[in-house]
Amino acid sequence: MKRKMLKRLLTSAFACMFIANGLITTTVRAVGPKTGEENQVLVPNLNPTPENLEVVGDGFKITSSINLVGEEEADENAVNALREFLTANNIEINSENDPNSTTLIIGEVDDDIPELDEALNGTTAENLKEEGYALVSNDGKIAIEGKDGDGTFYGVQTFKQLVKESNIPEVNITDYPTVSARGIVEGFYGTPWTHQDRLDQIKFYGENKLNTYIYAPKDDPYHREKWREPYPESEMQRMQELINASAENKVDFVFGISPGIDIRFDGDAGEEDFNHLITKAESLYDMGVRSFAIYWDDIQDKSAAKHAQVLNRFNEEFVKAKGDVKPLITVPTEYDTGAMVSNGQPRAYTRIFAETVDPSIEVMWTGPGVVTNEIPLSDAQLISGIYNRNMAVWWNYPVTDYFKGKLALGPMHGLDKGLNQYVDFFTVNPMEHAELSKISIHTAADYSWNMDNYDYDKAWNRAIDMLYGDLAEDMKVFANHSTRMDNKTWAKSGREDAPELRAKMDELWNKLSSKEDASALIEELYGEFARMEEACNNLKANLPEVALEECSRQLDELITLAQGDKASLDMIVAQLNEDTEAYESAKEIAQNKLNTALSSFAVISEKVAQSFIQEALSFDLTLINPRTVKITASSEETSGENAPASFASDGDMNTFWHSKWSSPAHEGPHHLTLELDNVYEINKVKYAPRQDSKNGRITGYKVSVSLDGENFTEVKTGTLEDNAAIKFIEFDSVDAKYVRLDVTDSVSDQANGRGKFATAAEVNVHGKLKENAEVTGSVSLEALEEVQVGENLEVGVGIDELVNAEAFAYDFTLNYDENAFEYVEAISDDGVFVNAKKIEDGKVRVLVSSLTGEPLPAKEVLAKVVLRAEAKAEGSNLSVTNSSVGDGEGLVHEIAGTEKTVNIIEGTSPEIVVNPVRDFKASEINKKNVTVTWTEPETTEGLEGYILYKDGKKVAEIGKDETSYTFKKLNRHTIYNFKIAAKYSNGEVSSKESLTLRTAR
């Protein structure tokens, strides 16, 4: 189409567009009557995100009455939704055309409405997928064209979201769904939704372009236990209201029935039960239902062939016979990959069912597990291949029937954005809390409509902004702590709770363990905890009653935890100030708040706000930083689950070490050995049991210590209580570099399993660095024994061994014969920073420090000093002197140096002929990047690499083995000049080859 409005946008002095917080700001004009007054209006957040949206003008204000064209031809439900919106916004419809009024034209592709084609100005929904639409607002006119009636209805929903206080930006939208069926399966166990909940939900689905509502409540007896019986008259009236509301909102009302609990398959009884199915379906069909589902989930019977045969017969005798019924939907008895597949092959039930069930029937599946973290593309490909069709997803989030104390308030998360290759039907199972389920459902609408552009974080923020208005920021604080569902056994799903806050907490513990200044971070956390309490109190005071009823207990829980978190910070500050009285007072408050939280039905922020209190209660400034401890075990489980020994000293209570239980199992004796980074005076070992299971919990122990890792001395034996609480094993102070915990007894969740296994979430040591412990170490020096005159010699400097100190910096002086060598440069090794300076002829001082803030490793080469051989010499001496190490306490320790001899011999260097590169060209050009390629120069003797230039400026030097390079972060549709030159070892650079081109539009 012609982009005359885009041209105007680019050339007008008044046009201004920028992106901020997901909103597009444009300068807007009032239309019809021109007043010359300009206002700012926002192209607001739209849900779902449109496939294509272009701002094509300045925008305008809709007049108080409009001309409506096409209402007689357009989809009735779309027109009704439009009229309802106009009435709610006090916009009247003119009885006769008024040229000074805004004009809105509405219709479908196959309607004969000339005004619609004119207003669309070449944009059309004709070539879009089903349910697609085009929307153009321009020059005081608004045009909405649907590919079909559903598309027109969805165009109206987008129009409703665009209009704010009668202002509408000038936009050009073409939009269509990624997935054909998008919606909800009301399939949770527990308190069913009320009738009003369902009506409200159905309207919400239509507004967010969700087109499927599967009615399958587990607690509706006529869906499951009484599936043979017809609904009573009172229930039929209720069902009719739901069916009608669904039709009005372009939602397929899918009636689900679960006969598997006691259906009979064979003989007269089987025929009777099949007829019950038909009769039940007929009654719903007569009420307007055109979509049906027969479920075999959560039953004991695994008669795969019979299940499929019932479906096939129903499909032939009812679905296809009717002619206007959508494809039948089913859930097999095995409905997750773990149940369906073994060693990459389908299990017997799944194989038989897949081979038998008719290809036209939609088969639902929940992903790798019943409730799971993700659906990777490989998993969808596997199941789609087994069933030889696109699958239908029943995603068990935000459902909470397996963990009722917690609310699932997060976005769709862990779903591959290419899932539509194998899935064309996507539904989510909501919570029994209908109102709060809308947050996740809102993001599900975005994911399933525009999968490729889905961003879970943006979708989540947008959902809360659109649903909660002035309370949105408070709701984000609350919901951020309630996104992760984890019942600590078989079910885990959703984005982690408050990940940014958890990272700050972890940073605090690291700083405290490393004796770093944490005052700024502590103040920041005080602010976070105060904001949590404030947000929850605001929500309690201002949330609508229907939402507050669903979350009041969790709001109280987060308030309690926030207060406990603040008390936990008070404990830490008191420890730092050595104020015992303040510490004990804060500890009592923190413990009481934790006890209150743990005794509550409500659950929230278990690994963040709750865990922080637990961590603070067990924190001790004498704790030796777990991340500096090397830990080994008698055995570790890394096959059956990820539970290595290192997890027992990672500072994370949610990971754990487990002795090897997969075949061949290691059934004892069990022990853990901790190697400390220095010699410490220790007096306490902390044992934190695994939190999610008692299996392997240590109840008997022996603690031994050693200075050399070979000769151990026992310091304490005893027993521990059989519970999940953190335990401390205290003893008289003793010097130790190694600590071993031997397991003398442990519990099991298996009969006769006592002592077989051992586990630990954390095993930590408390103590203080041994005063006056001698720090020793030795320097390493690496270099070739022979070098030719004129060549460079790389001299590697590092540390062979360091004892009783953590190194954060090294200081070396490299000595060389100034008559034989000339200093060239110093080169950093990975993860370190090197600063080198020639302090006098024959001496280079080399400073090495950590780039990451972590201790430097003991490595033979930490830095390389490059010397150029200038004259022949036999046995020229290289030495490292004045060597020292800076530790984590800011102390400096001297360490022993070393030396080495090198022979410098005469050499005959081959003649170097400098030539330019050949065949310099662009192999790929797009909007932001250009990739160039070339052939090496005709002569390569002495070739060291290549220098690349952009618009006359050097941008990169690369090695001689490279023959391509990508210039990145370019501007679109812009002319650039690229050049390349070859660099040789004699210091010469070839002539430059040049390339001029324009990036893509």
Swiss-Prot record:
- List the residue ranges forming a coiled coil, or say none: 515-543, 573-597
Q: Using the UniProt annotation, give all residue ranges assigned to the region (Catalytic domain).
A: 179-469
Domain Fibronectin type-III span(s) in chain numbering: 916-1001
What's the effect of swapping D298N?
Answer: 99% decrease in activity for 4MU-NAG
Q: Which GO terms describe its biological process?
A: carbohydrate metabolic process; polysaccharide catabolic process; protein deglycosylation
Q: Does the keyword Iron apply?
A: no
The record's annotation in SUPFAM superfamilies points to:
(Trans)glycosidases, beta-N-acetylhexosaminidase-like domain, Carbohydrate-binding domain, Fibronectin type III, Galactose-binding domain-like, Hyaluronidase post-catalytic domain-like
Q: Which residues form the active site?
A: D298
Keyword list, A-Z: Coiled coil, Glycosidase, Hydrolase, Signal
Further facts = Metal-binding observed in X-ray crystal structures is artifactual.
PANTHER family in the record: O-GLCNACASE, PROTEIN O-GLCNACASE
Q: Give the family per the record.
A: Belongs to the glycosyl hydrolase 84 family.
Q: What is this protein called?
A: O-GlcNAcase NagJ
